[in-house]
Amino acid sequence: MKKLIVATLLLGSGTLLSAQKTAKIPAYYKPAKSEMYHKDWIDFNKNGIKDIYEDPAATLDARIENLLQQMTLEEKTCQMVTLYGYKRVLKDALPTPEWKQMLWKDGIGAIDEHLNGFQQWGLPPSDNENVWPASRHAWALNEIQRFFVEDTRLGIPVDFTNEGIRGVESYKATNFPTQLGLGHTWNRELIRQVGLITGREARMLGYTNVYAPILDVGRDQRWGLSLI
């Protein structure tokens, strides 16, 4: 967990999808707390001092220990939580003033499948304006990231996760066969290309962590996902 937290902290700081329609992206606003941003470091905890965990020149282990020493139990707990995104659990597409009173006021480990265009099972696709085009989607995720960096105490960036077992789990992304179908091709190069496309589309949409297919044989009949 220790290395995952700081890896997220570090990472936080050819188009393959169908043709995008031209859409006006909201004006990129100046950071609300511009004094945080320095030439070679970011004052994540807003104390005006370059703490060890904020120093890119410090060793990874030193940064991890320094950050953990500053974290409360609530902040550590929240870094172990994944929050399902818009229309699943999260009700808001973008940050609102109420977020400063919600569970994730202390940060959150990950937000999964946020603004991917899907709602609860059986419901039609979301018509939220931030789902598409991809440039608008990436902008929206950046605005959410800004909340976690600028408006939480330690400024730990959130990880934007998504499924990648048969393409990115996004309404506009390329859909591939399930793991079982891909496995039946016995074509390693084809599977490599599927992974390449999935990665490029996820990156374009702004997702930072994509779950890969299980590279193993499912032998336990109690595990229903082995048939997916």
List each model region and its residues.
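Glycoside hydrolase catalytic-domain context in secreted enzymes
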Residues: 19-228
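Bacterial Sec-dependent N-terminal signal peptides
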Residues: 1-21
